[in-house]
Amino acid sequence: MHCWEREMLGKRSPQGDLFTADAQYLKFVGEDSFYGFLAREGGRLFRGEDFAALYCEDNGRTSVPPSLLAIALLLQTHDRVSDGEAKARADFDLRWKVALGIEIDTRPFAKSTLQCFRAQLVIHEGARQLFRRSLEYAKGLGHLKGRKMRVVQSWRRRWRT
């Protein structure tokens, strides 16, 4: 039994929300920052339905959207923080809330949820390849340069098989 066996795919609404941090604070955080980049491009980099193979189709509770967790893993690598600190930043850091596209008062995931998602990416080649393709897409658009590109290279080293 794996982490997601009892969960259905959680989805984000394709319609924007006026109350999310990215809608209200993107300029404050910096549109050209790594956080601003993820706020603008995260939905194109990681689509929830692309991770559907990791989830049960028709029963169980709804999961945290995998697109949100994928962005959280990038933020964690970028900021070089532990799982516990990643959870705390998702809960309280304005930059992370903007990048994740969540409301200010949202606590989006548990530490164990982030850990299980990472484990599924490592275990499932298809999910790992999807993650890599998304990062290559961003690189091709010219969005991953300098420090941002080093984050991608760090992910590649972690997932070498």
Predicted region positions:
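Active-site- or DNA-interface-adjacent structural scaffold in DNA-acting proteins
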Residues: 104-161
